[in-house]
Regions:
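Peripheral, non-AAA+ core regions of ATP-driven protein-machinery
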Residues: 1-212
């Protein structure tokens, strides 16, 4: 956001914001204000030696090429702005050995992760209160789409049980406080992006299947 009074922001027609971690090569260009179009659009760029270059297919770059047999990894079909892309959700769950359990999330809201952990413990019965839980969205991106909830809990449970999720599976679904998997919007676009990259199975909320 622009520092100080919002006078300058009111004067201009468009306000753009770059997001990204300095340790990663990818940057997201978001529209905070746009008098001539939607603020839901975004662009993904790659920082190279010769400058920024647009990423035409971010899904291919954000996924690990071979994670077969690796626990703690789940693939989600997310939508940021108007474009769908696949992201890799990584989780590591281990016994807390230094007193209070640690909770850490990179690229995902830590408060939402704590809520999902509470749902897993209260509604499903998984005992994670004495476990360290680390979550990472690969590529250094920050994702706010609630549809990746399902991949977050899948990655956490996969790591906790040390059981890998089949690499051909993609998913999308929002998790409610009662433990239900809630429907998400634009499911056709999400599935289409997964099919384009060769995923053979897609896990989605039951309600979303009615319109397919």
């Amino acid at each position: 956001s622009i520092a100080g009074p919002k006078v300058l922001e009111h004067i201009v027609d468009t306000v753009l914001q770059f997001e990204g971690d300095q340790h990663y090569m990818y940057r997201i260009l978001r529209s905070i204000k746009n008098r001539f179009g939607s603020t839901a659009e975004l662009g993904i760029y790659e920082m190279r030696q010769d400058g920024l270059r647009q990423v035409s297919n971010p899904s291919e770059l954000l996924l690990t090429q071979d994670h077969e047999g690796m626990s703690g990894i789940a693939i989600a079909s997310a939508i940021e702005g108007i474009r769908p892309f696949l992201i890799e959700t990584q989780a590591l769950v281990s016994s807390a050995v230094y007193g209070n359990p640690q909770r850490s999330a990179t690229g995902f809201d830590i408060r939402r992760m704590n809520m999902l952990l509470a749902v897993l413990e209260k509604r499903v019965g998984f005992k994670l209160a004495q476990k360290d839980v680390f979550l990472n969205i690969a590529g250094g991106l920050k994702v706010n789409d609630p549809a990746i909830d399902l991949s977050v809990i899948s990655a956490i449970l996969s790591s906790n049980m040390d059981t890998a999720i089949e690499p051909e599976i993609c998913m999308a679904g929002e998790i409610g406080l009662s433990g239900e998997i809630r429907p998400v919007n634009r499911i056709e676009q999400r599935i289409g992006e997964a099919e384009k990259l060769g995923f053979k199975r897609f896990i989605l909320p039951k309600y979303n299947m009615q319109g397919l």
